[in-house]
């Protein structure tokens, strides 16, 4: 009988990769907002709202990627930071 919680490794890697790619789009939005604000420092409230929104979603996607990597034992949330470089490195380790 097939285990109902069996994880398809390739599908999981694809999902993690998608989560990391999406997180980077939010990081690019943050970087763009910073550059725009430095050039036009007149709308501080819009700047902070945009940063807050994008940062929250950035963290959501990074946390989901971390949770998936934790499922296969490739990430230790207690001792590692769920940031892009760490998660990307773990994904590369799993892919090889």
Regions from the language model: what does each represent?
Residues 1-7, 89-96:
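Short intrinsically disordered terminal tails
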Residues 2-23:
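Short, charge/polar-rich alpha-helical segments
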Residues 6, 14, 49, 86-87:
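Intrinsically disordered, low-complexity regions enriched in serine, threonine, proline
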Residues 17-18, 25, 74, 92, ...:
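Intrinsic disorder/low-complexity segments in short proteins, especially the signal peptide
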Residues 19-33, 68:
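Non-transmembrane amphipathic alpha-helical segments
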Residues 35-85:
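Acidic, low-complexity, intrinsically disordered interaction modules
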